[in-house]
Amino acid sequence: MKTLYSLRRFYPVETLFNGTLAVAGRDQETTGFAWWAGNARLINLSGKLLGAHVAHAGLIVFWAGAMNLFEVAHFVPEKPMYEQGLILLPHLATLGWGVGPGGEVIDTFPYFVSGVLHLISSAVLGFGGIYHALLGPETLEESFPFFGYVWKDRNKMTTILGIHLILLGIGAFLLVFKALYFGGVYDTWAPGGGEMLRKITNLTLSPSVIFGYLLKSFFGGEGWIVSVDDLEDIIGGHVWLGSICIFGGIWHILTKPFAWARRALVWSGEAYLSYSLGALAVFGFIACCFVWFNNTAYPSEFYGPTGPEASQAQAFTFLVRDQRLGANVGSAQGPTGLGKYLMRSPTGEVIFGGETMRFWDLRAPWLEPLRGPNGLDLSRLKKDIQPWQERRSAEYMTHAPLGSLNSVGGVATEINAVNYVSPRTWLSTSHFVLGFFFFVGHLWHAGRARAAAAGFEKGIDRDFEPVLSMTPIN
């Protein structure tokens, strides 16, 4: 029987395109992969694969710079960021660039600089990618052994892993240095409704606090790491993570894999791809929850309110209105017999009544000043509500992070809601969807890598398929 596949490929793929189509000298006959398989043709060409990765980085950075400048060009300072469909400027504002008290944007020049720097960087990466893809050596092992590798070389692979971990650790410390030494970061919890820049002076480095987040429940008021609500803990956590990544990187560079790791793991290019996709899927799912629920790392001034925040803001807004109209908010009953404005949680805490009771564990900068030791404080609700709290809750009430692809956002029953989709909705949904696809990719490539390692990568022998021994359907 004529062999349908190259000995170098893992399993046969029949394609409408025959092997005569050559792309840059890397055709199906020599690599076992058709042109549309992309970088799979470069599995054993480390120099060309480097070019593909550098060019890919250039495309990513180009998008970041171009989209950054596009958002700057369309930005209207008088409107909140979350009403303008912005997904990049909120990140820059969170780092404290260009913002004043209350999250008001007072200078867009830093955003312009960011976009231009990314465009310049993308040009450098683009030239590097083109050079290595077209002109540079096909393989690096002979000319530049430090940068060369063989996929099955376990020691080299863990060295590369170590270098990546060190780079990630340096990235974590960049945020730490920004918060400590280079102007600080935006603090949504500053008194009076947010502060433009606050240098962090009292880092949380206690391991019991930092790692305590990991031991919290995922559910209810616990909220795992997503429940972090002060900058000291966030920046302190980056000190810990950066240190762990850097020391872990040094460890992986200096050591060789233990025997159990050599036995347990599959050591091939496709296996490393599957591990990476699995890790990215986990990151995507965590980021989805973080963006959706956390209003400290993702301040509501820039990203719009969280879902629970918009709901509690609605309850607060109508409490303020009806209290002014003479309602006794402490004792008024709702249609179910529970408190209309205020009620007690099962643990005795005073919380907002009505449907928003499910979001009793919300913490938000505009609401916390009205809490006492047992939840919401009735005397503070009667005497201490400030105009900025009323304005902010009314704004957040009409900007719930709900919406669909046709941009009908806001709560459908609220006549003053705005037609928009919140950046929170975009960012959390996109990270969930991409995380899911990456997880599927992880399963796919893990299955292929394990099959190749086990030696049955060519699929089931068609002569012995179970279906052949079964009776016909009719």
Swiss-Prot record:
Give me any GO biological process, just one: photosynthetic electron transport in photosystem II
Name this protein carries in UniProt? Photosystem II CP43 reaction center protein
How are cofactors bound according to the entry's free-text note?
Binds multiple chlorophylls and provides some of the ligands for the Ca-4Mn-5O cluster of the oxygen-evolving complex. It may also provide a ligand for a Cl- that is required for oxygen evolution. PSII binds additional chlorophylls, carotenoids and specific lipids.
| Protein species of origin | Citrus sinensis
Which cellular component appears as one GO term in the record? Answer: photosystem II
Top-rank taxon of the source lineage equals Eukaryota
Its primary localisation, in coarse terms, equals plastid
- Give the residues the record marks as binding [CaMn4O5] cluster: 368
According to its UniProt record, which protein family does this protein belong to? Belongs to the PsbB/PsbC family. PsbC subfamily.
Q: N-acetylthreonine is carried by which residues?
A: 15
Oligomeric and partner information: PSII is composed of 1 copy each of membrane proteins PsbA, PsbB, PsbC, PsbD, PsbE, PsbF, PsbH, PsbI, PsbJ, PsbK, PsbL, PsbM, PsbT, PsbX, PsbY, PsbZ, Psb30/Ycf12, at least 3 peripheral proteins of the oxygen-evolving complex and a large number of cofactors. It forms dimeric complexes.
Matching entries from Pfam families are given as: PSII (PF00421)
Briefly state the protein's biological role.
Answer: One of the components of the core complex of photosystem II (PSII). It binds chlorophyll and helps catalyze the primary light-induced photochemical processes of PSII. PSII is a light-driven water:plastoquinone oxidoreductase, using light energy to abstract electrons from H(2)O, generating O(2) and a proton gradient subsequently used for ATP formation.
Q: Which residue ranges traverse the bilayer?
A: 69-93, 134-155, 178-201, 256-276, 292-313, 448-472
Q: Does the keyword section mention Phosphoprotein?
A: yes
> Where are residues bearing Phosphothreonine located in the sequence?
15
Q: How does it sit in the membrane?
A: Multi-pass membrane protein
Which residues form the propeptide in this entry? Answer: 1-14
Q: Which InterPro entries match?
A: PS_antenna-like, PS_II_antenna-like_sf, PSII_PsbC, PSII_PsbC_sf
Under Gene Ontology molecular function, one entry of this record is: metal ion binding
Question: Subcellular location, in the record's words?
Answer: Plastid, Chloroplast thylakoid membrane
Gene encoding it? psbC
Keywords from the UniProt entry = Acetylation, Chlorophyll, Chloroplast, Chromophore, Manganese, Membrane, Metal-binding, Phosphoprotein, Photosynthesis, Photosystem II, Plastid, Thylakoid, Transmembrane, Transmembrane helix
